[in-house]
Amino acid sequence: MKLATLPALILLTLAMVIFNACSTANTSLAGEWKLVSYGDADAPTLALPGVDTSISFDEGQFGGTVGCNTFGGDYTLNSDQMSIGSVISTLMFCDQTSAQESAVLAILSDKTMIITQSGNLLTLSSGDGNSVVILEKK
């Protein structure tokens, strides 16, 4: 009888480890990320030097700054896909950062993003794969 419970116990432990690994994959977004590059997936544009452009993720909510404006919204994760709700932002005009701000917010406004994380880099790709926002963990 005891030999029959050992495989069941091992299977249960393995299932718990796998379940835990899956649930912690989503928490790797938590924290603050700074913009590295954005735009065309084949040739992303480098972020403007000296301009604080960052995004933070926390329990289904995100927010950040894209130069002189701030933005935020909500999201849900399903494996490597992020579904984004409405993105809201302030609307101040800043001549030197407006092109970067507009491009980053347009990409983030795509309702479905594909997430790829490699070390300290996080890539958010538009649903069609044509546009990216590449972030580095702060």
Predicted features and spans:
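Lipid interaction determinants
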Residues: 6-7, 11, 16, 20-138
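N-terminal secretory signal peptides that target proteins for export/translocation
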Residues: 1-3
